[in-house]
Amino acid sequence: MAERKTPLHKVRNIGIAAHIDAGKTTTSERILFFTGMSHKIGEVHDGAATMDWMEQEKERGITITSAATTAFWKGYQVNLIDTPGHVDFTIEVERSMRVLDGAVAVFCSVGGVQPQSETVWRQANKYHVPRIVFVNKMDRIGANFFRVEEQIRERLKANPVPIQIPIGAEDNFKGVVDLVRMKAYVWNDEKKPTDYVEEEIPAEVKDKAEEYRAKLIEAVSETDDSLMEKFFAGEELTEEEIKKGIKAGCLRMTITPMLCGTAFKNKGIQPLLDAVVDYLPAPDEIAAINGVYEDGTEVTVESTDDGEFAALAFKIMTDPFVGQLTFIRVYRGSLESGSYAYNTVQDCKERIGRLLKMHSNKREEITELFAGEIGAVVGLKNTLTGDTLASEKDKVILERMDFPEPVISVAVEPKTKADQEKMAIALQKLAQEDPSFRVSTDEESGQTIISGMGELHLEIIVDRMLREFKVDAEVGQPQVAYRETIRKAVEQEYKYAKQSGGRGQYGHVFLRIEPLPAASGFEFVNDIKGGVVPKEYIPAVEKGCKEALQSGVLAGYPVEDVKVTLFDGSYHEVDSSEMAFKLAASMGFKEGARKAGAVILEPMMKVEVETPEEYMGDVIGDLNKRRGQVNSMDDRNGVKIIAAYCPLAQMFGYSTDLRSMTQGRATYSMEFDHYEEVPKNVSEEIIKKRNG
């Protein structure tokens, strides 16, 4: 049994979460540099950042997969999980949020709170991830720390509490005032750009520092009654008391500590690392996570080395040298290489091959992983993202992650027959890595269909097939994932009876079919009294309804948000069978749903466009042409922000159109928001197209 090197209270599992251009990868890089793990600093500008280790990321300069990296700072082990900042990859963000204990939210001092930041912030709230804010790019023209503070309060509805304020901004950004110690840290560029000196607070920011120190003390005093008493008695709080108060508020998420700097110029990173170890939680300081047993009994899993092993597989990657890597977060107990673990979701035993700690794309072999740690396992056969690995003595299932349903599909075909098999293997591996990506076969055309969260998502999948698996694929036109639903309640009787010599078939059902609120899925209720339909046939009725849902009513799209109640029927002693009841239910459902005002639903995307004012009219006119509904118009740093809902069907190729309309000066972000009924004329077109 290996010994634990870092005690649990000195472990920090953190993520760097941010909008696409806030400088997240650069910040992660600098953290690795200052913690001594990385010798040549990688720059995103020249495509060499250690964190971005997949080729497409290097080209696009956006971070796609969360690489988990272990670094050390002042005796603390910091496991850094890099999260993507582009909306097509929200699944990756969700997945990393699930295993983080704390996060550093990076904002650009010029761009402030971007639409994407709101999505990431919501996800962090959902998983109760305490966070600190780092306002980056303080050296840029238009940098304004205090405006970002205001935006966090207004747009994210958080309580930002600066624990530093900047000294100067733009070209004059020299350093920061530490409001806890009331000292200035100044980076003198000429000497070593990474080193800073501690000085007295410069006269020009003294008043501002006093004002913000008072705000900090007030916020801190609200976290604890004894501090509140001292505050009202006018007594000074000690440095230790202030730190304790900041941490308490941060863990309860009533305070969001704010720091600033410029990662690119190496300013502000050391104090940021100090804040990570001082204010973000250790694994044993966060709430225990919930698990269930197979019989539905709930249980809480405390973060501790004692007790039976339990871990969550949160990421699967294919590494060109080692094969498949499964990243796990250990919540309880420990795991040794060469041992066995039980996958409680797939219900099978897994042999643990080698255990690795990853440093971006370098790896270190280890013999054991302990509670609170993150590492990668080589050689797991059946484990998927979101599965639990546990001890056979305590088969707990840790809470599952929710994965969104794909909204866009394209048909792919290999360019040569020889690639057919290679493509199937490639797609299977990619689908294992990414649960928001699905592969299916179109029954009518026999084509392979891939589905995902957006155009960029699928582009990158096709790109990876070529690079990693050497499969060159032709890609068809994007198809929208429409759905169907009903608008009114109906009752439907259906009798399925066949008598043609020998044993017949007999199934007879009465179904009540009703609409449910949006995003409710499917609900089946058995309301049979007096055994008019025997118990053993009820599951067949439900199965028949479910199968009918899949093939749709109007145009063959899946039906959702429907409740079906089986309330009457009859059976035949000899001729009734599961098959007969399944068919009766399936045909009955289809017939009933047609009378229940069936409609087609389409995915609506939340679109935000940032454009210079002179193009605003064109952009809005174009969105209206695409059946968009403009919700709001806003000013942000001299550019106009247009927020709208648009049907996905109208948004293909939007980036190219927007570029030509605004001479490349506008940017946009788009994510799936909800399903909405399509207008009648569009519905008729869809039905005509589908039914040929």
Curated annotation (Swiss-Prot):
Record GO terms (molecular function): GTP binding; GTPase activity; translation elongation factor activity
Alphabetized Pfam families for the sequence: EF-G_D2, EFG_C, EFG_III, EFG_IV, GTP_EFTU
UniProt keyword Secreted, yes or no: no
Principal place of residence: cytoplasm
Residues noted as binding GTP in the record, renumbered to the chain: 18-25, 82-86, 136-139
Chain ranges of the tr-type G domain: 9-284
Family the UniProt entry places it in: Belongs to the TRAFAC class translation factor GTPase superfamily. Classic translation factor GTPase family. EF-G/EF-2 subfamily.
Gene Ontology annotations of biological process type: ribosome disassembly
SMART domains assigned to the protein according to its UniProt record, in alphabetical order: EFG_C (SM00838), EFG_IV (SM00889)
Its job: Catalyzes the GTP-dependent ribosomal translocation step during translation elongation. During this step, the ribosome changes from the pre-translocational (PRE) to the post-translocational (POST) state as the newly formed A-site-bound peptidyl-tRNA and P-site-bound deacylated tRNA move to the P and E sites, respectively. Catalyzes the coordinated movement of the two tRNA molecules, the mRNA and conformational changes in the ribosome.
GO cellular component, one term: cytoplasm
Cited CDD domains: EF-G, EFG_III, EFG_mtEFG1_IV, EFG_mtEFG_C, EFG_mtEFG_II
Protein name (database record): Elongation factor G
UniProt entry keywords in alphabetical sequence: Cytoplasm, Elongation factor, GTP-binding, Nucleotide-binding, Protein biosynthesis
PROSITE patterns associated with the record: G_TR_1 (PS00301), G_TR_2 (PS51722)
Localisation: Cytoplasm
Gene3D superfamilies hit by this protein: 3.30.230.10, 3.30.70.240, Elongation Factor G (Translational Gtpase), domain 3, P-loop containing nucleotide triphosphate hydrolases, Translation factors
